[in-house]
């Protein structure tokens, strides 16, 4: 069954009532990490994903800063826990690339630290390859990352990786992730 919803309006508000939702339709938030270099991450993204990254990184930052209750338990939020300064830098890098491409931007840069410390997983191949593989599947005409055995696997969520496996050179078969 596809997602069904009803929209009702009054003079001030628009209400959306979700009456049924399919497991195949997911609300998703993510930050794509396709390189250990922030600028390279931003430059590698297509127009649509780059635009979304600005908003999604901002939403995750707000959740981590306690400014909203949305997304607080999502793996994408948990992977940035303790690294709000680096997440702000990620968000700002997406905004700067968005503007450099000539698109109109209505988002302010987030406050950040002088030298933010990246999360433990930043630059870890399983995270990078799983995100590259996801983008290859989303837009095969645009993305052509070489992902090897990661081709058929889902995201590696750093918050779900057991400490004993963190930073090891492991393939998708060693991590508890679902096939895409």
Where are these regions (language model features)?
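Cationic, low-complexity basic patches in intrinsically disordered or flexible, solvent-exposed regions
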Residues: 5
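Expand to "…catalyze enediolate/carbanion chemistry for C-C bond making/breaking, isomerization
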Residues: 22-180
